[in-house]
Amino acid sequence: LYPTILANAGTMKNKGLEIRLSAIPVQTKNFQWVTTFNYSTNSNEVVSLSNNQFRVERGYFYAGYLGNTIKQDTHIVKEGEQMGNFYGFKSIDVDENGKWIIQGKDGNPKPIDQQQQEDKMVLGNGLPKHFLSWDNTFTFKNFDLNLTMRGAFKYQILNTPRLYYEVPVSLAHGNLMATAYDPVFGKRPLNDHQELQYVSYY
């Protein structure tokens, strides 16, 4: 028996804007160039995670489990906040022994070994706020060529290869990245005994 059940009970609100501009800069008997610019932006909010039939114990749940090595979630889905929020410890420094210093819930620095669940915070968001694309179609007689460039802006990513393989302690399990012993924050490398930690540095 399982203590929980998955249900499609949530409500989310989305709003955004999309702008599309097209032009034909060149058009002759045998040649045509059509160009199109497209811009879009979107924002969202988790309105509710419950309904009349199903209800979560709290107004949030965690997602994005990193696996047995780290045993931490990467995201939080919370009522009143955006989807895609990274949630974890904010790393602000390394101490003289090469161990993480994080920002505590009171805003003050504290050693990673003294971490508490309450010290976790929203570290960023993995959903792009802006999209921009530029599409060009060139037609010459019966031949055509299409070139498209697309960009996504104002979002964060989690670099999991660095999280796992840029930490000296991982040498006990295999190869490391060449940057594993580079100074962190320009100060010193991580300690050989600093455990894998999901922090904002990555």
Residue locations for each model-derived region?
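Surface-exposed, extracytoplasmic segments of Gram-negative outer-membrane nutrient-acquisition systems
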Residues: 1-9, 43-127, 135, 144-202
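Active-site-proximal structural scaffolding
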Residues: 2, 10-15, 30, 129
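Secondary-structure transition/hinge residues
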Residues: 27-29, 45
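Membrane-embedded beta-strands that build the outer-membrane beta-barrel scaffold
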Residues: 15-25, 33-41, 132-138, 143-151
